[in-house]
Amino acid sequence: MKNVLIIGLGRFGIHIAMQLNQLGHEVMAVDWKEERVDKVLSFVTNAQIGDSTNAEFLQSLGIGNYDICFVTIGDSFQNSLETTSLLKELGAKLVISRAERDVQEKFLLRNGA
């Protein structure tokens, strides 16, 4: 069983959260929109509303305690990149970030994904 953090609860993030829950993993889900967090409460271990580009908020989650951190933010590549970079700075063991284009993948890989 892994302890997993998922940041970004659009369709992709919710799908990953559901699958990991079904596999028996502990899932912490985060999004800045309350209605998205409400959608996952029934099948994740814990969920919080918050801004993942805020280092203090991320630090409060205890980033080093997660085996894997997924960044599934789809509506803002800038936020995805900032979140990925902050996660690595805060001691994330493994960061897997969503990229829609090759150039995004390159930026994410250079910044901690």
Tell me what each language-model feature is.
Residues M1-A113:
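Cytosolic regulatory regions of ion transport systems
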